[in-house]
């Protein structure tokens, strides 16, 4: 009798183990939530985007936004193009 049961269990193992694993997983999941309880999230007054906007506003409050670096000054620090290496500089 045992060899017949073992042969049947071996043949139908995928059909037996999946429902058993599903039930064990579902019971464990529910049991874990029952033991832990609902998680308490801290209530935030502002969202992350609002905090970021507030921080950028505070940073720009002390600056004069009309004073910007000209494009000519920015271009001085960029490397010269490869094709302009052999050309003479204009004075």
Curated annotation (Swiss-Prot):
Protein known as? Small integral membrane protein 12-A
Corresponding gene? smim12-a
- Per the UniProt entry, what species is this protein from, by scientific name? Xenopus laevis (African clawed frog)
Location in the cell: Membrane
Q: Which UniProt keywords apply?
A: Membrane, Transmembrane, Transmembrane helix
Matching entries from InterPro entries are given as: UPF0767 (IPR031933)
The record's family statement is: Belongs to the SMIM12 family.
The way this protein sits in the membrane is described as:
Single-pass membrane protein
Establish whether keyword Transmembrane helix is in the entry.
yes
GO cellular component, alphabetical, reads: membrane
Please state the protein's primary subcellular location.
membrane
> Which residue ranges run through the membrane?
12-34
């Amino acid at each position: 009798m045992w060899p017949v049961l073992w042969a049947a269990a071996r043949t139908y193992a995928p059909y037996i183990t999946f429902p058993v694993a599903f039930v064990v997983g579902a019971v464990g999941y529910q049991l874990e939530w029952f033991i832990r309880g609902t998680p308490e999230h801290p209530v935030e007054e502002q969202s992350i985007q609002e905090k970021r906007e507030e921080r950028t506003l505070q940073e720009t409050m002390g600056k004069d936004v009309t004073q910007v670096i000209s494009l000519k000054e920015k271009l001085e620090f960029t490397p010269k193009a490869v094709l302009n290496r052999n050309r003479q500089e204009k004075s």
